[in-house]
């Protein structure tokens, strides 16, 4: 219940993500699939690095920087995607941003994408899209379920694609991973 209330008020659950028991081993296979979608020789920044399993599966030619709301070890850039202002990541430091099950927890996805366009040309991500269309009893139940997870938004697949396309990205690849979709977007 506390998670629903915090999510309703759009608060990042820092305590939850500081507890390593809330970073599940089953997510490693998702990160392995995401790493396979990252082009070789990429300079990668991962948002929501967790246990940093993505780093293990990236092509050795890639460089990697973790970021998260809590410290995840050496080199971690610590900040919250729900706090403003978002940090300056420096000019020409990264090519690829990876979001593994993170965008659901972001309050203002359009603002984060606007910020991100200054820093990367490729986004590799997973997202658990909303299924219900428009206001309905089913939509209300789905929203409650998403709040229980701590998710702060309810984008359907086509809405998420549009958010990226409106910012100059084009969809390069997408596929299923369990109940989520894996996407690769590249700037035109």
Identify the residue ranges that each predicted region occupies:
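Conserved N-terminal segment of class I S-adenosyl-L-methionine
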Residues: 1-92, 177, 181
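A conserved beta-strand element that flanks and buttresses the S-adenosyl-L-methionine
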Residues: 98
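Hydrophobic adenine-recognition pocket in adenosine-nucleotide-binding enzymes
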Residues: 102
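A short, conserved alpha-helix within the catalytic core of class I
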Residues: 105-119
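Conserved beta-strand signature within the Rossmann-like core of class I S-adenosyl-L-methionine
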Residues: 120-131
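Acceptor-substrate binding/catalytic loop of class I
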Residues: 139-159
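A SAM-dependent methyltransferase catalytic signature shared across enzymes that methylate proteins
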Residues: 157-174
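Core SAM-dependent methyltransferase catalytic element
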Residues: 172-188
């Amino acid at each position: 219940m506390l998670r629903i209330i915090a999510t309703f008020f759009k608060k990042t659950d820092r305590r939850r993500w500081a507890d390593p028991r809330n970073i599940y081993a089953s997510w490693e296979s998702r990160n392995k699939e995401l790493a396979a979608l990252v082009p070789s020789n990429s300079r990668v920044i991962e948002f929501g690095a967790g246990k940093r399993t993505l780093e293990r599966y990236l092509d050795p030619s890639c460089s990697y920087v973790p970021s998260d709301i809590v410290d995840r070890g050496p080199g971690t850039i610590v900040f919250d995607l729900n706090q403003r202002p978002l940090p300056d990541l420096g000019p020409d430091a990264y090519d690829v941003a990876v979001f593994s099950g993170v965008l659901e927890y972001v309050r203002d996805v359009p603002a984060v994408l606007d910020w991100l366009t200054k820093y990367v040309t490729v986004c590799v991500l997973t997202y658990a899209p909303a299924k219900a269309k428009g206001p309905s009893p089913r939509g209300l139940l789905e929203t409650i379920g998403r709040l229980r997870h701590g998710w702060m938004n309810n984008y359907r697949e086509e809405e998420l694609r549009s958010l990226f396309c409106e910012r100059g990205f084009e969809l390069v690849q997408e596929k299923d991973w369990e109940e989520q979709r894996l996407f690769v977007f590249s700037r035109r």
